[in-house]
């Protein structure tokens, strides 16, 4: 009788372990820099990754009608072309740090999610500030 209970518990634990760890490997999303990706392109081809770096100045092209954003992401050493379908975040600009989630396909990173890195410091407007002063403060923070 004890043997059947022990065997049942082991089967249940084995099944739970397989579901947890088996699914974990398929759902991992790696964070890479352009240099790390270019060192091992085959490993990450058609796999979901997060690519982090800076938007290279002079490379941003945005088609407002089609909602297509193209730019080059760099880590100062390597560069990767990025395509993102959708409206860019409000703080998106050249030279800005970004993280793009997506997949590499045919040499271009196809972004599905675009996040802008920004300072974690928050300074609320002081009483009596004019809208122009608040706008200037926001622009300086970016």
Swiss-Prot record:
This is Cytochrome c-type biogenesis protein CcmE. GO terms for molecular function: heme binding; metal ion binding. Its main location: membrane. GO terms for biological process: cytochrome complex assembly. Residues 24-142 are periplasmic. It comes from the Bacteria. InterPro entries: CcmE (IPR004329), CcmE-like_sf (IPR036127), NA-bd_OB-fold (IPR012340). PANTHER family: CYTOCHROME C-TYPE BIOGENESIS PROTEIN CCME HOMOLOG, MITOCHONDRIAL (PTHR34128:SF2).
